[in-house]
Amino acid sequence: MFSLQDICRKHLFQLPDAFDEYILQALGLYWEKHGSLQRIRKDAVFVQRNLIISTNEALRIAASEGNERVINLLLSWEGNFHYVIIGALEGNRYDLIHKYGSQIKDYHMILSSIQNANTFEKCHELSNCDMWCLIDNAIKYNMLSILQKHRNFLTEELENQEFFETACEEQKYDIVLWIGQTLLLDEPKFIFDTAFKMVDFSLLTIGYSLLFDNKMDIQDDLTSLLTEHLEKAAAKGQLYFMLETLKHGGDVNFEVLSKAVENDHRKILDYFIRRQQCLSREDIENLLLSAITNCASKKTLNLLLSYLNYSIKNITEKIVQHVIKGGDYTIIILLKKKKINLVEPVLTGFIDQYYSYCFIENFIREFAIRPERLIKMAARKGKLNMIIEFLNEKYVHKDDLGTIFKLLKNLVCTMKHKKGKETLIILIHKIYQDIHLETKEKFKLLKFYVMHDATIQFLSMCKDCFNLAGFKPFVLECLDIAIKKNHPNMIQNIEILSKYE
């Protein structure tokens, strides 16, 4: 059962002014050498009515003094018993450590709360770990003085390298600088890798300080290293990294800025191309081509075009080639708005490369290209499968075959390209074999074949029509058409056909 004093101590946040020292001592709210002790918040106490400190700080002080009565009071006020251990270590109160140590599963958990290096080392000794563990934790919690104290222990390059890497990754700058200046390292340039990985400007500047001021041996060509840094910074869009690197050497060239292009970092492009004028016109043209290849954003493409004043005569053909190869036609949209029309050569290239209909469909929708134009272009290239895929997507019902049939016949009649006509006629004949035509329509199709000198299709269809009424006189009509059109091969075949009864 709780006593009245316990209840008062735990829940009394406002001490009456009438409480004198005797009453406070009776309630257990008096701290010897300090005065009255009052809880004012969940995590803070009021000492002698004029000093506010955290509950844990009060607990640390009480433990260092060995005042168990105050310790118990503060623990009842939700103080962290870790601070009992810290205070006990500071005051060499090992009886308290023995009493409360059983509640500590791992003394490493306390290290983050310790500010004093000596106390830190004492606490670590309670863990019974080796020196490597102490050094590792000293780095983790920024205890440089511990590393300096045990400098003679740090003689192996590989172990030192591990500590250096830990310090870099933990961003403990003072320790990084001290290790770099003092110890032998296996891979000192690890600091730069970490700086770029974590985008840590402080690490970068420390790295250059070690490299140039302390002559850190990186066993690499400096020019190559600085160029590598510029490329990494450009790829990440870190302009300040680039400017810091340039203080020590290096050159911003096409290779460097191409990294910025690949990742759409326009601020870097604008700084070095417009303000610093680092590149020739030819280099800017090549950057534009690189941007096309890497599917750069409209803003990046527009920026590069603006540096060229939208004059692309020297690279028009290359632009078309890069668009066709990469498949991204954003640049074509931008150029068309500036009255530079490259739609035709690009569409021709897409057809040559046999891009999927889905891709082509988006392109023709973007540039409002009529389907008939696409079919004719594909026919001229002999892309029969592409035309079939296109028609299957556009006309999904079997009833649409008649519509397709008429469309293709009209296209043949308006085409001059011989190979294109042949491609479409092959498709027309395929459709004929899948639909039903009346006798009159069959004769019309035969005339169509004769007019366009489609001998193979004509003879194939004649086999189907041979027994139809009126076929023989119709063949003579076809002969007249072939003679008028001057199709020698067709004439010869019709003459042979007309001899059969």
Swiss-Prot record:
Q: Which UniProt keywords apply?
A: Early protein
**Please, which domain of life does this record's source organism belong to?**
Viruses
Q: InterPro entries given for it?
A: MGF_505
Q: Does the keyword Acyltransferase apply?
A: no
Q: What induces it?
A: Expressed in the early phase of the viral replicative cycle.
Pfam families linked: DUF249
Q: Indicate yes or no for the key word Phosphoprotein.
A: no
Q: What does this protein do?
A: Plays a role in virus cell tropism, and may be required for efficient virus replication in macrophages.
Family membership: Belongs to the asfivirus MGF 505 family.
Protein name in UniProt: Protein MGF 505-4R
Q: Which organism is it from?
A: African swine fever virus (isolate Warthog/Namibia/Wart80/1980)
Q: What is the lineage of its organism?
A: Viruses, Varidnaviria, Bamfordvirae, Nucleocytoviricota, Pokkesviricetes
